[in-house]
Regions:
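A non-catalytic, amphipathic alpha-helix used as a structural packing/dimerization or gating element
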Residues: 132-142
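Glycine/proline-rich loop-helix segments at beta-alpha junctions forming the active-site rim
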Residues: 72-131
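Conserved active-site segments centered on acidic
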Residues: 1-80
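Residue-level recognition of oxygen-bearing side chains
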Residues: 17, 91, 150
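Conserved small/polar residues in nucleotide/adenosyl-binding loops
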Residues: 143-150
Length: 150
């Protein structure tokens, strides 16, 4: 089983969007039994809060099903238990190092390093642009799935 943890600052915008987009892609390809997909935060600011209304609206617009979700913070145990820890931006990478320590197993990646882009996924909490965030996540999720198909 391939275990993927998507990570952003608060776990209410980008990482839950990535979680539910990837779950839909996996389900559409009948691979649900081969993947475990979750999301978490690097900060404690939003712990317990639900998905941001803009993320919900974008997922709904794109017919991406989502379930009840409450923000959680990533832990050292998550590092041990997941194959991929996928951060949305450079600040998330730095905060992940602070939380889980050195990435000896090369599990931690920035989302867009799976593409030809070397930029961060813009945070719609600040930009208000959930469309750009969705496009980045959707493209990379398909790319990541194709790399792991058997």
């Amino acid at each position: 089983m391939i275990k993927i943890m998507f990570v952003c600052h608060g776990n209410i915008c980008r990482s839950p969007m990535a979680e539910f987009v990837m779950k839909k892609i996996v389900a559409d390809n009948k691979l649900t039994d081969k993947f475990l997909i979750n999301s978490s935060a690097t900060s404690t600011e939003e712990i317990g809060n639900g998905i941001h209304r803009g993320t919900k609206a974008k997922l709904t617009e794109m017919n991406i099903p989502f379930t009840s979700h409450h923000a959680v913070q990533i832990t050292k145990d998550d590092y041990k238990n997941y194959d991929y820890i996928i951060a949305m931006d450079s600040m998330n990478l730095r905060n992940l190092q602070r939380i889980v320590g050195f990435d000896n197993e090369k599990k931690i990646h920035r989302l867009l390093e799976f593409t030809n882009y070397s930029r961060d996924v813009a945070d719609p909490w600040y930009t208000g642009n959930f469309d750009v965030t969705y496009t980045d996540i959707d493209t990379v999720s398909y790319t990541h799935l194709r790399a792991h198909e058997t």
